């Protein structure tokens, strides 16, 4: 029996997908332990898995949750910068606390979320094999497509490739505080030093829960990337009240801002205004970010 460790952000969109993988791994006779920053979500214990804290005094649970609470009300570049600031502080915690904690539990392999940048370094430091899982949009740089944070369409033109390359370079500059921490840590240990963000992910297996057709046409997709489609457990679903009687047979438009930025009331209003006059019904999911009443009359 192997003992697989999971390192991922402590947010529903990442944890729930990893729970699906953990469930499938356990069904094959292996043990799974989650390593998280922040307060362990009830969903992990309910599913029968153990959680071990990675934060220590470097990034305490309360501070971690407060940072994500703030992220929920940010958008555009402000949201991206705050996300990367969280990532830098998380990198300090994972690199300082992670190796000893993971070693103590006796883990034999790691499954690391693509945005948990220092997770692969923990695996390399301990001599453990690891796989990378992309639970968001695929982050792998590719000058043939626009970066994930832009609103651009892909264009097969020289000017578009230059535009894309400049944007990816700008993103690399934002990654720099995290990358510098990882590079210094690995250099001190005598490990190979990554030159770019792509070097920190698994060179054996990278799983994306996107359907392949959802991704822009890439020219530089690593051979180890596998598109497997959505990762979910049937037992994840919780009953949510819904006014079924208000459906009138017209096509439905479903709008959600996910689990990280679902407190941007203005964005929901923009979506509602964009749907005005269409021969369709709009269903807005606010998740746990805000109550529907907070949006007022749309």
Please describe what each predicted stretch is.
Residues 1-53:
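N-terminal subdomain of nucleotide-sugar transferases
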Residues 131-216, 222:
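Active-site-proximal region of nucleotide-activated glycan assembly enzymes
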Residues 88-161, 213-214:
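Conserved nucleotide-sugar donor-interacting segment of glycosyltransferase catalytic cores
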Residues 210-298:
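Donor-nucleotide binding loops and adjacent catalytic segments primarily
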Residues 35-37, 54-57, 113, 133-136, ...:
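Generic beta-sheet signal
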Residues 50-108, 160-168, 181-182:
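Phosphate/nucleotide-donor binding subsite
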């Amino acid at each position: 029996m192997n003992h697989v460790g999971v390192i991922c952000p402590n947010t529903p969109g990442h944890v729930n997908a990893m729970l699906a993988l953990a469930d499938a791994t356990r069904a094959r006779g292996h043990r799974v332990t989650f390593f998280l920053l922040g307060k362990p979500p009830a969903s992990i214990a309910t599913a029968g898995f153990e959680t071990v804290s990675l934060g220590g005094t470097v990034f305490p649970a309360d501070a971690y949750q407060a940072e994500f609470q703030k992220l929920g009300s940010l958008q555009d570049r402000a949201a991206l910068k705050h996300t990367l600031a969280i990532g830098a502080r998380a990198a300090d915690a994972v690199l300082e606390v992670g190796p000893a904690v993971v070693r103590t539990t006796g883990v034999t392999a790691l499954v690391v979320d693509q945005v948990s940048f220092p997770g692969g370094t923990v695996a390399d430091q301990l001599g453990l094999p690891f796989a990378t899982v992309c639970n968001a949009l695929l982050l792998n740089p590719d000058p043939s497509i626009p970066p994930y944070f832009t609103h651009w369409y892909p264009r097969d033109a020289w000017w578009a490739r230059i535009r894309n390359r400049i944007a990816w370079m700008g993103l690399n500059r934002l990654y720099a505080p995290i990358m510098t921490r990882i590079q210094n840590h690995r250099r001190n240990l005598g490990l190979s030093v990554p030159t770019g963000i792509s070097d920190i992910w698994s060179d054996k297996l990278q799983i994306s829960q996107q359907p392949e057709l959802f991704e822009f046409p890439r020219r530089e997709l690593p051979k180890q990337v596998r598109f497997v489609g959505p990762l979910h457990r049937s037992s994840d679903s919780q009953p949510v009240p819904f006014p079924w009687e208000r459906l009138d047979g017209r096509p439905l438009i479903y709008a959600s801002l996910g689990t990280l930025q679902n407190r941007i009331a203005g964005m929901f209003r923009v979506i509602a205004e964009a749907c005005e006059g269409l021969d369709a019904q709009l269903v807005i999911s606010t998740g746990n970010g805000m109550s529907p009443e907070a949006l007022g009359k749309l």
